[in-house]
Amino acid sequence: ALQNGEVRVKVLATPIHPSNLLQISGLYGIAPELPSTPGSEGVGEVIETSSGVTHLVVGQQVLLIGGGTWRDQIIAPAASFIPLPDLGTPSSEIIEQLSMTAVNPLSALLMLTSFVDLEEGDWLVHSAANSAVGGYIIQLAKQRGIKTVNIVRREGLAEDLMSKGGDVVLIDGPDLVAQIASATDNAPMALGIDAVGGKTFTRLAQSLNNGGTMVSYGVMSGKPVTLNPAMLIFNDIRVRGFWLSKWFETAPMAEKQAAFGQIIPLIVSGALSANVDSRFTVSGIKQA
């Protein structure tokens, strides 16, 4: 039976993130207490409410945040779900896209807006541009008139990234800084966003203008970041880290509501989306 203030939610869709796989394999920054259910986010439908619940009703769709989403049903305090606007009967495509709202699109929005005040016509550079976060950065930047230099590690990705709204696509390598300068006609670059670490981070930092900001949110290369102190001293490069879990812990509720209020309508309207590769049932975990 439900405790006072709890709701029962049927899980409609929940994505598989690289961080989930890292956590399962014991390689993530924080180890969960066992037994633990993986999963970071998703979308569900309220199927039962308890006394004391006023803002959620049976049949309402909600975003799942806070972990443990790889299951058929979740029982949790009503306050731990984010209510969605009335969507009628959304398509399975919209349900899938909404299930990915709370991690990657939110990360992209916050990194795009929290560190540097970019204006229409400004440039940014980011690595792992073909990742899910990278795709959302491209789409959100395009909607704001911000131009993107999109760094990838292999050929054959330019067409997809340009179709999302990317302006320049470059392959990472030793001459990347010169490539960026050439492709953008030496445009000032105030923001770099990196998920790779190692030499890629350094090259992005070297491409920034004086006072530019580097934001690190991943280390896909497994390599530490090296920066010549001269870049910090003479170019006044700032280095910031971004971890979404910390934002969820510390951001005021009004800030969270404002962020979701920007993202959800874009996803529902189809203006913001990610590619879905494969679909699995919970019992199909071995195939996944």
Annotate the PLM regions.
Residues 102-174:
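Mid-domain Rossmann-like dinucleotide-binding core that forms the NAD(H)/NADP(H) cofactor-binding site
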Residues 1-15, 27-68:
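Glycine-rich beta-strand-centered segment in the early N-terminal region that forms part
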Residues 22, 61-128:
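NAD(P)H dinucleotide-binding glycine-rich loop of Rossmann-like/cofactor-binding domains
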Residues 69-72, 152-160, 224-229:
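Short, glycine/polar-rich helix-capping loops at beta-to-alpha or helix-loop-helix junctions
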Residues 19-25:
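Cytochrome P450 core scaffold surrounding the K-helix E-X-X-R motif
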